């Protein structure tokens, strides 16, 4: 029998399925040493984990190439782009393109396109870290796609 796949928003998924995804991420990132530990940390039974583990995947896990384009409005200070790229690299993103405008009135715009295939954290976590940088006035996702 051929299996059909559906793209479903997270907010309509049963809680058990969300927790299975969490348990799988804990195992993948080596935050749990065993299925039993991952299930316990995710607050599900091992039975639930085994029932759904091969049935639910994060969207980015089944795509070939996930590219996100980020827009930044930065204060013009020495080393800001380097520091920003360091945070992006630490998240496991591969920078594909960089476009920086000439600074005007102490501000510059930067657009980055990054591959998120090898990210070691969620995109929301990366955005939160980038927003915490003192020279970042604005950061937003302006595009994303699967290629």
UniProtKB/Swiss-Prot annotation:
SUPFAM superfamilies named among the record's database cross-references = ACT-like
Note one Pfam family from the annotation: ACT
Boundaries of every ACT domain copy: 69-144
Q: Where do the TM regions start and end?
A: none
Please list which residues make up the signal peptide: none
Q: Name the InterPro entries for this protein.
A: ACT-like_dom_sf (IPR045865), ACT_dom (IPR002912), UPF0735_ACT_dom-cont (IPR008310)
Give the UniProt family note. Belongs to the UPF0735 family.
Protein name according to UniProt: UPF0735 ACT domain-containing protein GK2605
Species the sequence originates in: Geobacillus kaustophilus (strain HTA426)
């Amino acid at each position: 029998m051929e299996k059909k796949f559906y793209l479903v928003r997270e907010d309509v998924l049963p809680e058990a399925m969300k927790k299975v995804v969490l348990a799988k991420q804990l195992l993948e990132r080596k935050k749990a040493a065993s299925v039993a530990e991952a299930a316990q940390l995710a607050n599900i039974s091992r039975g639930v984990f085994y029932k759904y583990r091969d049935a639910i995947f994060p969207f980015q896990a089944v795509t070939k190439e996930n590219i996100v384009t980020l827009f930044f409005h930065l204060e013009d200070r020495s080393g800001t782009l380097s520091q920003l790229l360091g945070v992006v690299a630490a998240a496991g993103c591969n920078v594909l393109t960089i476009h920086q405008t000439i600074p005007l009135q102490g501000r510059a715009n930067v657009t980055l396109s990054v591959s998120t295939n090898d990210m070691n954290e969620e995109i929301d976590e990366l955005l939160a870290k980038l927003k915490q940088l003192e020279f970042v006035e604005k950061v937003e996702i302006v595009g994303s796609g699967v290629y």
